[in-house]
Amino acid sequence: SKDSVEIIRRLPNGSTHSKKISLGENFRINFEEEFFNGEVVEVSVAPYAKINRSSEKTISGSGGIFTQPSSWAYLGPAFSYDGENYDKRSFSEIEEVEFRTSTSGGWISMIQHYFLTSLLPNQSSNSLLQGKKNKNDGSFSVGFVEETKKVAPGTSIKNEYSAYSGPKIKGNLDLMHPKLGLAIDYGFLYWIGQPIFWVMNLINQAISSWGWSIVLVTVLIKIFLWPLSYVAYKNMGKMRQLQPKLKELQERYGDDRQAMSREMMALYSKEKVNPALGCLPMLLQMPFFLAFYWVLIETVELRHAPFMFWIVDLSVRDPLFILPLLNMGAMYLMQLLQPQPAGVDPMQARIFKFMPIIFGVLFAFFPAGLVLYLSLIHISEPTRLER
């Protein structure tokens, strides 16, 4: 057929080795091999396959080495075998020590940003998985060698295995192997990242917009964190009410910081206020921010996904820097409304005032989808602080 090709190798001793390569759906490739023993003695054969590539990482798109998603995404081999569902081994690791392990089933992959190529040996056979550096050209290879099979004279043996070469779409990977979807690596916060993507994907299936999916997931995260955030916002309100009394203590004790601190702590205890709770909303958001970042740089579905007007790709920076400016303005407004704890060092206070600018410049080169999430978080904060 037009989607398959067969290669036949005829050996001088009368043996033949044929391989049929067929293109399946969802970037699947099927391999069917047959070996006929034309000799007069029994022979042993071991099916094998491997993937070669260099260790060079190409960074493309807008941004630099620190903010371009492809610069942070993992590039290198990964394996799945008995006792280990997902094992990343960097090029430097397998250069130092060749990787070898025996398993039944499993898979091997070469992973890069958004894409991967995987080999899946015959899942009913025992195989040796390998990863090493090739001395002849400096490239790296990962492969498998299945268990040796004996072929009697005048008989043949068949074997099948498969491969995947395409984008890291979880649905496709799960169809290939139950554990291949782990190649979409959300880092150590995968237990947050995976549910975030699941909800985003569910919303996108309903409304066909990844941008609005980010907006709605942000709202859901805010609702989820609201009980704890409410405690912090209520505490901030009490802190604002205490500002006149705190200023009075500052004027009364002047340079006697020890006495002033003692009286402030007594006042906080009396009024049941905890100044440290002012950091709680930011601390609660931190793991979700990091998980969101990894979801955005790992999710191929967001590649070239537009949102509104000028945002043509949520996976790269905002080309007009409008979202970073909105984020900067929201951070500055939140800073104005949030009460500053009494007794703060003047130098620290001045540095704190520049934080919106520092973070605004930093996030200007991060993916637009991430800055959209941050902007929504920061825009919602001043409203709550006012209440």
PLM region spans:
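Transmembrane helix interruption/hinge and helix-loop junction motifs
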Residues: 208-209, 362-371
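Soluble non-transmembrane domains of integral membrane proteins
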Residues: 1-182
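Alpha-helical transmembrane segments
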Residues: 335-347
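Lipid-exposed faces of alpha-helical membrane segments in multi-pass integral membrane proteins
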Residues: 216-220, 224, 284, 322, ...
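Interfacial loop/helix-cap signal at membrane boundaries in integral membrane proteins
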Residues: 164-213, 305-319
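Single conserved hydrophobic/aromatic residue that forms the stacking wall/gate
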Residues: 377-387
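Core alpha-helical transmembrane segments of integral membrane proteins
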Residues: 185-244, 250, 280-284, 288
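Transmembrane alpha-helical segments and their cytosolic interface motifs
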Residues: 213, 265-293
